[in-house]
Design a protein with these regions (language model features):
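Acidic, Gly/Ser/Thr-rich repeat motifs that build Ca2+-stabilized beta-propeller blades
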Residues: 1-80, 138-154, 205-244, 269-272, ...
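Hydrophobic/aromatic beta-strand positions that recur at structurally equivalent sites within the blades
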Residues: 28-30, 99, 161-164, 175, ...
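Short, conserved, GDST-rich strand-edge loop motifs in beta-rich repeat architectures
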Residues: 72-90, 158-160
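Mobile, glycine-enriched helix-loop/loop "lid" segments at the mouths of ligand-binding/catalytic clefts
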Residues: 103-105, 164-191
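Alpha-helical segments with a strong preference for the paired helices of cellulosomal dockerin domains
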Residues: 289-312, 321-339
Length: 339
């Protein structure tokens, strides 16, 4: 949806066409007579990108806080990137692009932001924001730090999580995650921006990463500030903590057994995910100390009794400081009040 959707009614879609096979980025308008329907005849093509193969045609679109539209494109498909699109700045394949759709320029239905990293770079598409990506399956911004997080689906060995910076090369198809590709080949990792996290394919049946969000909601205190993402095959959902010293932490949250296709957030920054034709919300059982599926004064009474018993019980240690005290009571009351 356009940042000013409430005023202009614009929304954008990314779909595939054939003859020739291509990705189409198009703008539609809401039906002026029905706010729950699109005006089918309002379609305006913004951008088309030819696709040489039948896979890696999806991705992500989203508006940044700068008002520009970011779009990810896969490497064109097949296996191993046979056209070397990931390392080719003259194609939009294998990249995340950044365009201004509010100020069309020349014969384009968009313009190039003047601070895009490859402005005036010879033989480079100036739309490109970052490249060397295989098949980004969902990206999102952390609303507090502004970091752009992306999940890039691997080839045969590794799935990766990246933080995207303008102008950087993320390695594909010379690297798969932090490893030279194909295995046994020579590469220089110093030439590329490496993932902040990676996990191995087919271990415990995982196979394809689905990117999520850094959680900034209030319902699940233990997930605050952590990047929540999943795997399509197993439905595993993890919480990743980025550490300045490099000692990152990846925690298992749940194996949902859902083929997770996407994550989303609502107006309160609470987290949802979808798959198997359904939408699910991540909800907390933190604070439900008595296990009755309710957060209420009975949980406070139980916590007070645990504290008065002068022992330690990790059930009541809501702030994880290895002490049961009034700070846990304050946190529990805030959970109940929704603060």
């Amino acid at each position: 949806f356009h940042p000013n959707y409430s005023e202009n009614g614009y929304f954008y879609v990314n779909y595939t066409e054939h003859n020739p096979r291509r990705n189409v980025i198009a703008r539609y308008s809401v039906d002026p007579d029905n706010p729950n329907e699109a005006d089918y005849f309002s379609s305006e093509i913004i951008l088309e990108v030819n696709q040489p193969y039948t896979n890696h045609n999806g991705g992500q679109m989203g508006f940044g806080s700068d008002g520009y539209l970011y779009i990810s494109f896969g490497d064109g498909g097949s296996a191993g990137d046979p056209q070397n699109n990931g390392q080719n700045l003259s194609t939009l394949l294998g990249s995340i692009i950044r365009i201004d759709i509010d100020n069309p320029s020349g014969n384009l239905n968009y313009s190039i932001p003047l601070d895009n990293p490859f402005i005036d770079t010879q033989n480079a598409r100036e739309e490109i924001y970052a490249y060397g990506l295989r098949n980004v399956w969902r990206f999102s911004w952390d609303i507090e730090t502004g970091f752009l997080w992306a999940a890039d689906v691997g080839q045969n060995a590794w799935e990766e999580i990246d933080i995207i910076y303008p102008g950087l090369n993320y390695g594909w198809n010379e690297m798969e995650a932090s490893y030279c590709y194909p295995p046994g080949s020579n590469c220089n990792p110093d030439d590329f921006e490496l993932p902040v996290w990676e996990y191995e394919l087919y271990v415990d049946d995982v196979c394809s990463v689905t990117g999520g969000y850094v959680y900034r909601g209030n319902d699940i205190w233990s997930l605050k500030g952590k990047y929540i993402y999943g795997d399509w095959c197993t439905g595993d959902i993890w919480a990743f903590t980025l550490s300045e010293d490099g000692n990152h932490i990846n925690e298992d949250i749940i194996r949902s057994n859902i083929n997770i296709t996407s994550f989303g957030i609502d107006e309160n920054d609470e987290l949802f995910f979808c798959g198997n034709g359904r939408v699910f919300k991540l909800q907390s059982n933190e604070g439900d100390l008595n296990g009755d599926n309710l957060l209420n004064v009975l949980d406070v009474i139980l916590l007070v009794n645990l504290i008065l018993a002068q022992g330690y019980n990790d059930i009541g240690d809501l702030n994880n400081d290895n002490i049961l005290n009034v700070l846990d009571i304050i946190l529990l009351v805030n959970m109940i009040l929704g603060d």
